[in-house]
Amino acid sequence: MKALHLSGTSFDVVNEYPRPEPLPGEVLIRVLRAGVCETDLQLIQGYMGFEGVLGHEFVGIAESGRFAGQRVVGEINCSCWKCDTCRSGLPTHCPNRTVLGILGHDGAFAEFIAVPEQNLHAVPESLSTDEAVFVEPVAAAYQILKQRLVERGQSVVVLGDGRL
């Protein structure tokens, strides 16, 4: 399969990259769209020393499992679900996690990606594929609101240099 592979600070389109073999509990996804994120650009500059296929914002078709044949998007953190952090309800902070296209797990800048089935969400027919690729960045912003309730009349400050 074709894939955009990062090694050090250089990346190449690889025409014969190995198609992922899903681990138990994972589903093979045929990627339809993948979005470029500021994190991808930082990884190309050497951030976190990632080597592999970039890309964590995606929409694709599930090849197997309960979503077989459906368009899906996926959460990027692949948690262990065994540690105290996961069991306490904070799997996105799992110290043993891999992260699609960022940390220890090939991402979506390829024809196929393997993703834990529990990370997948079906895309409703009312949402186009071009719109669905933005689910991950919108969900990342929304996650902040879930972690900290902001009530009417309170002030907040937003810091950071991300693209959202």
Question: How does the language model describe each region?
Answer:
Residues 1, 70, 153-154:
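Nucleotide donor/acceptor-binding cores
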Residues 4, 27-28, 157:
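Conserved beta-strand elements of the Class I
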Residues 5-12:
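Extracellular beta-rich ligand/substrate-recognition surface
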